[in-house]
A protein has these predicted regions:
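A glycine-rich dinucleotide-binding beta-alpha-beta segment and adjacent secondary-structure elements
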Residues: 312-378, 406-419, 538-592, 597
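Short hydrophobic core segments
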Residues: 15, 149-160
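Beta1/beta-strand and adjacent pyrophosphate-binding region of the FAD-binding site
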Residues: 6-20
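Extended, charge-enriched "interface" segments that sit outside catalytic cores
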Residues: 436, 442-444, 453-458, 462-614, ...
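Conserved beta-strand-loop-beta-strand element in the redox core of flavoprotein oxidoreductases
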Residues: 132-148
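Conserved N-terminal/central alpha/beta ligand/cofactor-binding core
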Residues: 8-9, 26-130, 146, 158-175, ...
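An anion/pyrophosphate-binding glycine-rich loop and adjacent beta-alpha core
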Residues: 41-43, 59, 86, 188-326, ...
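Internal hydrophobic alpha-helix adjacent to the cofactor/substrate pocket in enzyme cavities
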Residues: 384-405
């Protein structure tokens, strides 16, 4: 034990500088709190230890929402992008999701600079070994492995996969963080001393291979969308450029046979790994064993950066022995001569049950202690980043004596994620999906600014310039919707030829432009030649106007559902409500309600094991008080 010494005084300490820690530290500092962020390695700030991309299905929604609130991730992705693709364009706008392939090293450098240049924020390379409290259970300081004692009033835990991290490659294992970095070996003991129960989760990553050893002619080339789409509402898409392609390939029966013959050497199947793995991101050995009927599995070969030949095998994560990895990779067309640069591995780490948190991500049992990211049981950079933002903002607001920052299920995917975590918990690493939201037509990525930028502006995290641009676009959208409702388009041979070409009924008399636009086959852009009086408005405003007119009926139905949900959310439950002393509640409901302690009737109704009858009783009991 090193001799402790006073090292400094801050309002908030953020432990970990991955995607959660970055957003937490930036938000807290921008709100005026003296903040310090600790990382085991400065070279790991904003590291992408798994796929070198930001966004994807549902994750793109989170990135846009974070940007609308004043977060940094979307700007960093735009500044370092190699390729931009909008996913799920064959489906409705509710599930359209942006994914940006990024330059891993440049992303790290962008985020490192963002932290270094942020007023009110100090950046420190050190391992935190304890969180210290006084006799009243109040946080007083954090202590480093070298004895530095930093006086703080609040702590945000954003430890990623570092807490007692342990990697596995076949029979080989060692205590390690991701990418061979030093793990956080001692902090877990300090958390247990605070009464926090920890559990083990695991995740994995594929090998990185040398691009010069790949036969790209045997793989399908995948280019970015033209023109590229920006992740941030503040980025001018005209400044973006697709730089590198990705590639698509497939495993085959030979690949699967090599894996099956060596499955006994897998630490997952051999029982060496105790942690629970991600359900929606299985390893290739998991895919082969669980989906034996499938003759092949798709993977993506993705560049790690502009100035490296290192490439990422998305969809082929593994913890099989190194020589087995080489053998099965080389059965794949295009990878017959492939050379591994980094070995695939699984990593096991400590995390918590997030039902121990409030919806501000503060621990119920330890005031001013917050959790964010994989520490809370989630997977994914984007899920981590939004939790970091929520924790950072709420830690700052609480210290300043201000009301908390809350966003609910009807307002955002961020609210859905937080509510799922603190209400339902997770038995395996939680991943955001559009299917997790009841209101996904309202929670589109294209309207994240309309939903959340007012909150970001009210917090002081959106600049006046961005706010005025937003207001202008919203005004343009509303004016264009009104114009389209009034403007009539007369039938012409050219218009009817277009309508027939897309499988829509030709016109026999004039119709309002909005009615024509409500036809599923007809787009706003395609109507431009038949709408000569159309004003020049921002493309984002035009997109919003089109979607809101085309799906007006569905949107009104979901808005009615939201009003009913809000009625329940606005019925608060006192924090000290004694469920066990109430008559009429079932024992299972009492146990669940006592443990999770929901903040409202709405949250209580979403707890597994609490029935509609229990909710009815609870409403009556609360009204009697």
């Amino acid at each position: 034990m090193m001799k402790p010494y006073p090292a400094g005084s801050y309002d908030i300490a953020v432990i970990g500088a991955g995607h959660a820690g970055i957003e937490a530290a930036l938000a807290a500092a921008r709100l005026g709190c003296r903040t310090i962020i600790f990382t085991i390695s400065l070279d790991a700030i904003g590291n992408m230890p798994c796929n070198p991309s930001i966004g994807g299905t549902a994750k793109g929604h989170l990135v846009r929402e974070l940007d609308a609130l004043g977060g940094e991730m979307a700007k960093a992705a735009d500044a370092t992008m190699l390729q931009s693709r909008m996913l799920n364009l064959g489906k409705g706008p509710a599930v359209h999701s942006l994914r940006l392939q990024c330059d891993r090293k440049r992303y790290h450098m962008y985020m490192k600079a963002a932290l270094e240049n942020q007023p009110n924020l100090s950046v420190r390379q050190a391992e935190i070994v304890s969180i210290d409290t006084n006799g009243a259970g109040e946080i007083t300081s954090v202590t480093t492995a070298m004895g530095g004692v930093y006086s703080v009033r609040a702590v945000i835990l954003a430890t990623g996969t570092f807490l007692k991290g342990k990697i596995f490659v076949g029979e080989y294992s060692e205590e390690s963080g991701p990418d061979g970095m030093h793990p956080a070996a001692h902090l877990s003991d300090s958390l247990r001393a605070l009464g926090i129960t920890l559990r083990r989760f695991k995740t994995g990553t594929p090998a990185r291979v040398h691009g010069n050893s790949v036969d790209f002619t045997r793989l399908e080339e995948q280019h970015g969308d033209e023109p590229p789409v920006a992740a941030s509402f503040a980025t001018d898409p005209a400044t973006l450029q697709n730089k590198l392609p990705c590639y698509i390939g497939y495993t085959n029966e030979n690949t699967h046979e090599v894996i099956r013959q060596n499955i006994g050497r897998s630490p997952l199947y051999g029982g060496a790994i105790e942690g629970i793995g991600p359900r929606y991101c299985p390893s290739i050995e998991d895919k082969v064993m669980r989906f034996a009927e499938k003759p092949r599995h798709q993977f993506f070969l993705e560049p790690m950066g502009e100035n490296t030949r290192e490439m990422y095998l998305s969809g082929l994560s593994s913890s099989l022995p190194e020589e087995v990895q080489t053998a099965f990779y080389r059965t794949i067309p295009g990878l017959e001569q492939v050379e591994l640069m980094r070995t695939a591995y699984a990593i096991e780490y400590d995390c918590i049950d997030p039902t121990n948190l409030k919806n501000t991500l503060e621990f119920k049992a330890v005031p001013h202690l917050y959790g964010a990211g994989q520490f809370n049981g989630t997977s994914g950079y984007e899920e981590a980043a939004v939790q970091g933002f929520v924790a950072g903002v709420n830690a700052a607001l609480k210290l300043q004596g201000k009301p908390p920052f809350l966003t609910d299920r009807s307002t955002s995917y961020i609210g859905t994620l937080v509510d799922d975590l603190v209400t339902k918990g997770c038995m395996d690493p939680y991943r955001m999906m559009t299917s997790r939201s009841e209101y996904r037509l309202l929670l589109r990525q294209d309207n994240a600014d309309a939903r959340l930028m007012p909150q970001g502006y009210a917090l002081g995290l959106i600049s006046e310039e961005r706010w005025q641009q937003f207001l202008t676009q919203q005004q343009q959208k509303e004016q264009e919707k009104k114009r389209l409702e009034k403007y009539s388009i007369a039938p012409t041979p050219a218009l009817n030829a277009y309508l027939e070409s897309v499988g829509s009924t030709p016109l026999t008399q004039p119709v309002r432009a909005a009615e024509l636009l409500r036809r599923p086959q007809v787009s706003y852009a395609a109507l431009a030649p038949f709408d000569p009086d159309r004003p020049a408005i921002h493309p984002h405003a035009a997109e919003q106007a089109e979607i809101e007119l085309k799906y007006e009926g569905y949107l009104k139905k979901q808005e009615a559902q939201v009003r009913e949900m809000r009625r329940l959310e606005e019925m608060p439950i006192p924090e000290d409500f004694d469920y066990a002393a109430q008559r009429g509640l079932r024992l299972e409901a009492i146990e669940k309600l006592q443990r999770i302690r929901p903040a409202s009737i709405g949250q209580a109704s979403r707890i597994s094991g609490v029935s509609p009858a229990d909710i009815s009783v609870l409403v009556i009991l609360l009204r009697q008080q």
